[in-house]
């Protein structure tokens, strides 16, 4: 995953990403010791508990560093108290979670016990079905896109599927979608 992130970063920024791996959230403290003072952001792949620990450290030592996280940190078990501590954190996840009032969301949440990992799996299966039923259009019509439960879906000339996810931000303890 680090290599794919760096390749994309190089395309967008023209420089290498400063990628570091950690085993424990406490290891993050060492990354910022001796790091360039212009470090402005951190992208983490972590559990909610690990993210809370990392956020706590950065709030006291590097409060200007913006935190971006993967969907792994977004769990159904996250409490209002958790979100109150996560103010400013942005994370990517599927747009299906914006549709919590829809009947489809309610049905899936009910059958999965509201477990986000299972709901993501359902969304991937739904999108696979959508892609199968629109394969010819994806293959033959340049720029053709589909609105799936996991994001905007498109395919390149090799039929490699690309997906744009939704970004969310915690603002005053509430999770809100960020305009892409």
Regions found by a protein language model. Give the residues of each.
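Generic recognition of flexible, low-complexity loop/linker segments
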Residues: 32, 41, 55-57, 153-155
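Extracellular/periplasmic periplasmic-binding protein-like sensory domains
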Residues: 11-18, 36-39, 55-126, 136, ...
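Short, solvent-exposed coil/turn elements at secondary-structure transition points
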Residues: 23-27, 73, 95, 173
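Segments of small-molecule ligand-sensing domains
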Residues: 110-179
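Extracellular/periplasmic Venus flytrap/periplasmic-binding protein
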Residues: 1-50
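Active-site proximal loops enriched in glycine and acidic residues that flank catalytic Cys/His/Asp
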Residues: 46, 69-72, 93, 169-171, ...
């Amino acid at each position: 995953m680090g290599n794919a992130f760096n390749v994309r970063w190089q395309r967008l920024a023209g420089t290498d990403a400063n990628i570091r791996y950690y085993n424990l959230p406490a290891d993050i403290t060492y990354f910022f010791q001796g790091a360039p003072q212009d470090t402005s952001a951190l992208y983490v792949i972590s559990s909610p508990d690990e993210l809370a620990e990392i956020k706590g450290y950065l709030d006291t030592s590097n409060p200007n560093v913006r935190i971006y996280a993967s969907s792994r940190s977004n769990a159904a078990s996250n409490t209002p108290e958790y979100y109150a501590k996560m103010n400013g954190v942005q994370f990517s996840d599927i747009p299906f979670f914006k549709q919590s009032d829809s009947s489809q969301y309610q049905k899936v949440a009910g059958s999965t016990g509201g477990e986000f990992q299972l709901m993501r799996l359902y969304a991937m299966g739904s999108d696979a079905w959508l892609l199968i039923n629109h394969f010819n259009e994806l293959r033959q019509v340049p720029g053709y896109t589909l609105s799936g439960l996991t994001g905007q879906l498109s395919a390149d000339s090799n039929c490699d599927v690309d997906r744009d996810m939704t970004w969310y931000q915690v603002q005053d303890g509430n999770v809100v979608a960020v305009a892409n």
